[in-house]
């Protein structure tokens, strides 16, 4: 789905180019909703076109497709354009429609991503901050190198995920969790560097 860019969005993009000329990523592929109405359209598109196969492919990775059947709703949830319960209620309503078009594993997977992961972790965040941000359970001490910022680590799935993140300001949760975060942990990258990288890379990054 393509979103039209209003005057405020265009002005903001010009400001970003002028004031942050050396920032990560690119605005060439910018295609995100900036209003509640447009975010609702994205939710509707996901429910109509993607939810039916989300359960089967929710943990898949594809070198040539970073979207697959994912909802792309995280930026709208984190910015307040959509409410988590709003998305859950709409998904359940879609599941209950006659015809059994939406399989249970798709509904469960989507609801779990919002309620069982996002909202649970948000609760952990509020219950443990600010000390949680300074914790370092594994005592990691290594810093990120430039290859983590341009996708030249030499590890194909990791480089693919990094380059995808740079191009779109987004990559799905399996790339983030199972590939990027996992490799940062296995190579001993400090939590502060990890946090900084994720905050710099994604359109849905924001402190709660």
Please identify what each model-predicted range represents:
Residues 1-110:
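Glycine/tryptophan-enriched, flexible segments
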Residues 72, 77, 82-208:
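Active-site-proximal binding-pocket segments
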């Amino acid at each position: 789905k393509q979103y039209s860019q209003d005057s405020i969005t265009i002005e903001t993009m010009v400001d970003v180019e002028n004031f942050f000329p050396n920032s990560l990523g690119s605005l060439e592929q910018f295609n995100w909703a900036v209003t509640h109405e447009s975010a609702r359209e994205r939710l509707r598109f996901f429910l109509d076109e993607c939810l039916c196969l989300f359960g089967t492919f929710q943990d898949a990775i594809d070198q040539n497709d970073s979207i697959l059947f994912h909802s792309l709703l995280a930026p709208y949830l984190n910015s307040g354009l959509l409410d988590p319960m709003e998305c859950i209620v709409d998904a359940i309503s879609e599941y209950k429609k006659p015809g059994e078009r939406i399989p249970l594993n798709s509904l469960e997977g989507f609801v779990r991503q919002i309620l069982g992961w996002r909202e649970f972790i948000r609760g952990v965040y509020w219950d443990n901050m600010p000390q949680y941000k300074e914790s370092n359970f594994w005592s990691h001490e290594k810093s990120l190198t430039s290859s983590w910022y341009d996708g030249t680590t030499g590890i194909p799935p990791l480089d693919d995920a990094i380059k995808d993140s740079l191009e779109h300001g987004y990559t799905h949760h399996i790339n983030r969790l199972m590939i990027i975060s996992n490799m940062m942990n296995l190579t001993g990258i400090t939590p502060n560097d990890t946090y900084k990288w994720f905050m710099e890379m994604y359109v849905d990054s924001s402190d709660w």
